[in-house]
């Protein structure tokens, strides 16, 4: 289960117990406050039951904002747009939408997914605008989620940024191997399939217990149709997964300098690199000078090819895409 699926799963539990209204807003396709306003209005309209009092209140409120409502020809779901002349009008409307939700008797859980996108908004100061709007709200529980760890850390950990110290950071550790193994075995058994313990162990180790990749591998294994899955068949399928993506991975080579590519490959082969400028690493992979390695790592992080994380042994670098990492190991 990835972060987005986890948010929806939590929302399902909240809705089941009727604790709050839950709104999910994907910011990935947005590029401005204007786009965010449209996404939030659309999400609110689709979630609040229109036949109930709160839904009728929202429709009445929405009309005062002069919206343009269109319906998706495939799903029939409404899409809300606004056609204002100035950026300020969109900021006023966004603030009004948030205040409307905040004033309801029932709590609201609002998830902004891919939140790091706001750092590249056309407004330039979008973080400050949003922080000013959000700070006084006490009836909305915000979830800020993002796939770019580097940018998310900068947004919430940099003392010079508007959202510094404004949230509680939640880190999700990897699921324990034994527990994960039982779960995988149970899911296959439910579908009248058998999978050996060493095959499960290989899946868990190969995917490093990263839920997205573990689920992807297991789905591919299940889709292969095999009834009795052993270690060898799992290894073959993992190899096929990498071969399917090889053309994409080769394209990355043309997007990077030779030095960046060499360092990316070195990080992949190590799995985790704690001291990239240490003599041992430099002698083993000959990636250049310590200064050159540092510049290359910074560039690779900006390109979201690698990420920086911490464990009990200290801070380390790893390749962002695990399938790419496994493919590079074989080169």
Name each model feature, range by range.
Residues 243, 247-331:
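C-terminal leucine-rich, beta-strand-based interaction scaffolds used for sensing/assembly
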Residues 80-148, 157:
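Conserved Walker B catalytic segment
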